[in-house]
């Protein structure tokens, strides 16, 4: 499976029953993805009647979408480990097993984050040598975007884990986003090397002495939106706080701007003049454009989208899998982590 993506299509197993807007928005996103790209085939895993009812309203290439039956759904509130073990016919478990078996190359879900993270490791499995697979979403910055790694998978990370995060994040930004020699920073409470908690203090010299990444030192949270670094390294608790703050501030800002523009006749007239520029700017800070967060370091690509995902984010998450395939990210991660001998063995 680690030598994946050899078929005519990049095959993506999509959890059709996961998320607040399933199956409607999930199916719509899948249709939009195949209508936009002839390189992808989607396996919609879910309750057939519900999925096929949604599909009936769309026009698409029938060869590019397949419905894979699943009779169960893992709810967000369920304990992830227990749910993965007990609900073998759930849309999440069946979709992940499609990746494990090699029938599909990638997995996308807006469903239970815990079940996806647990299932990714237990079912799909880690690349040999990867200590902890991180969840790594793209976040908007003044200069484009940055990769936030980790944002939810490893709360109790070790220094060696963060070093691997930095390397995997560098591979992703360079090959998927086209950033040459991406700048790597570790989240800290100050720019000085001696600052930070025990984890940061222990990790800093390891990153500093790592020859195959462009480590620029500590990055404070306020400098992340300015684009100070391309790869934002942190353990999952810190990363999740950063991500949720990003989302919350963005929503609040949009509400405040809209309220201000409608507060008087003068502001309404002014709003008409600035609307095109404002709309363009706000679009740059829309997280949906990037799709979901990849879980790097697994044998197959696992992508987790927001639970509230609409069709556009699902579509972009599916299309993200094509770039992952074409750029051979897993092979490059192995190279970055010093696993050239593993690649040679698999090529025999």
Language model features with spans:
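Solvent-exposed alpha-helices and their adjacent loops that cap or buttress functional pockets
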Residues: 3-8, 15, 35-36, 59-60, ...
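N-terminal phosphate-binding or glycine-rich loops at protein starts, especially the Walker A/P-loop
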Residues: 5-52
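Short beta-strand segments
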Residues: 15, 44-46, 68, 109-111, ...
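Short glycine/serine/threonine-rich phosphate/pyrophosphate-binding segments
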Residues: 22-26, 89-102, 106-120, 127, ...
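Glycine-rich phosphate/diphosphate-binding loop of Rossmann-like nucleotide-binding domains
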Residues: 24-25, 37, 41-43, 49, ...
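Phosphate/nucleotide-donor binding subsite
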Residues: 60-104
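Glycine-rich phosphate/nucleotide-binding loop
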Residues: 121-134, 138-148, 228-232, 236-346
């Amino acid at each position: 499976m680690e030598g994946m993506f050899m078929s005519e299509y990049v095959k993506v197993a999509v959890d059709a029953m996961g998320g607040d807007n399933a199956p409607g928005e999930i199916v719509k996103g899948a249709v939009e993805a195949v209508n936009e790209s002839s390189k992808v085939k989607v396996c919609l895993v879910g309750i057939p009647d519900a999925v096929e009812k949604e599909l009936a309203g769309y026009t698409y290439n029938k060869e590019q979408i397949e419905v894979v039956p699943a009779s169960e759904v893992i709810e967000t509130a369920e304990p992830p480990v227990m749910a993965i073990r007990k609900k073998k016919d759930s849309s999440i478990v069946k979709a992940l097993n499609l990746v494990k078996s090699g029938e599909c190359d990638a997995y996308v879900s807006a469903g239970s984050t815990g079940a996806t993270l647990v299932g990714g490791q237990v079912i799909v499995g880690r690349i040999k040598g990867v200590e902890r697979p991180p969840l790594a979403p793209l976040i908007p910055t003044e200069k484009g975007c940055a990769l936030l790694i980790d944002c939810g998978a490893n709360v109790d990370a070790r220094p060696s884990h963060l070093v691997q995060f930095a390397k995997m994040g560098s591979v992703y930004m360079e090959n998927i986003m086209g950033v040459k020699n991406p700048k790597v920073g570790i989240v800290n409470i100050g720019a000085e090397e001696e600052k930070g908690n025990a984890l940061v203090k222990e990790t800093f010299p390891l990153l500093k002495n790592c020859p195959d990444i462009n480590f620029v030192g500590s990055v404070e949270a306020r400098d992340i939106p300015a684009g100070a670094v391309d790869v934002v390294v942190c353990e999952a608790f810190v990363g999740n706080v950063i991500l949720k703050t990003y989302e919350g501030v963005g929503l609040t800002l949009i509400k405040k701007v809209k309220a201000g523009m409608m507060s008087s006749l003068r502001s309404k007239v002014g709003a008409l003049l600035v609307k095109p520029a404002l709309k363009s700017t706000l679009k740059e800070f829309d997280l949906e454009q990037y799709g979901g967060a990849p879980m790097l370091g697994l044998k197959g690509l696992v992508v987790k989208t927001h639970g509230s995902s609409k069709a556009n984010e699902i579509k972009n998450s599916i299309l993200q899998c094509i770039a992952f395939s074409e750029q051979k990210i897993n092979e490059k991660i192995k190279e970055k982590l010093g696993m050239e001998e593993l690649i040679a063995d698999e090529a025999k």
